[in-house]
Amino acid sequence: MTYTYDLTLGLPHTNHRFFAEQLMLKFAGHFQWQSIAAAAGLPLSSLRTADGSEVYASFYYIDTVIPAAAPLESFRLDDTVRFAIDLRAFKNIAFEGRVRFDRPERLNDATSPSIRFANIFITPEQGNSRLRVAPPAQADFHDLPPLPNEENPYHITRAASESGALGVLDEAWLQERTSTVTYAIDVDRDTNGAGLVYFANYVAFMDTAERRAVPKGRERSLRHRRIAYYGNAAVDDTLAIDVAVFRSGAHPDMLGFRYTIRRQEDGAIICLSEAVKALA
């Protein structure tokens, strides 16, 4: 079954870059959660573990592809964007969402942007810094197509935790420079209703570090990004965002980026990402 949602863009959905990446992910992620809830037949906020603890469908992997024919900044105020989501479930605890979005009349076009989401149910064990995998006791997702273990994005995130790379940048991309930016989490702006640092805001953190690393010049437009999430952070913590800038002779009008986000509390890596952006 395909879950379909329409969003008409207004001021709350846009910024100076129009349908910017972190805003797009907020709404696409919300539709992913709504789809999981529809499959469960229950609001996700009502799900509990066997011992009564709250559970949350946390994102652990995102792969976003934005074709040049439909850049995010081409979606403007009052445009309607349709999201179509197909889910697969892994052992009642993890989910893959294959998402396509575009203007309704173009959604079936092969040039539509796409996202691959992966979620897993977790519960905070000792605040945001200690999250435990926690299957809900009262939900059954057997009606969803199964996600084979070998296709579970978990394997991608585990490999990236060892190599530091996510496969967006190959050996043709040569590192040009690096930069580190610190960011104090803003409890009012950066958290969600579950009390966690919101997954989409990690992109805003990375964009902030990227702007510091690259001198002001041509605008950059996302073409491909992968994100692996490994944890969260206390709402009063500070993050260190490392960004490395890459160039490729084969892609002179593009820049590559590799990001690492660490929390100050214990120095743990909570996110890795790689992206390729076109220079406008």
Feature annotation, model-predicted:
Residues M1-A84, F90, M206-E210, V214-E219, ...:
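Hydrophobic, proline/glycine-rich low-complexity stretches
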Residues A40, L44, G97-R103, L131-V133, ...:
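Generic preference for flexible, low-structure residues
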Residues N15-R17, M24-L25, H30, Y61, ...:
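A generic structural micro-environment signature
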Residues M1-H30, I93, S112-P113, A118-A194, ...:
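Non-catalytic linker/capping segments at the edges of enzyme domains
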Residues Y3-Y5, Y56, Y60-Y61, F141, ...:
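Sequence-level detector for tyrosine residue identity
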Residues A70-A160, A233-V235, F246-A280:
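HotDog/MaoC-like acyl-thioester-processing domains
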Residues L169-S179, A184-D242, F246-R258, I269:
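Acidic/His-leaning functional-site neighborhoods
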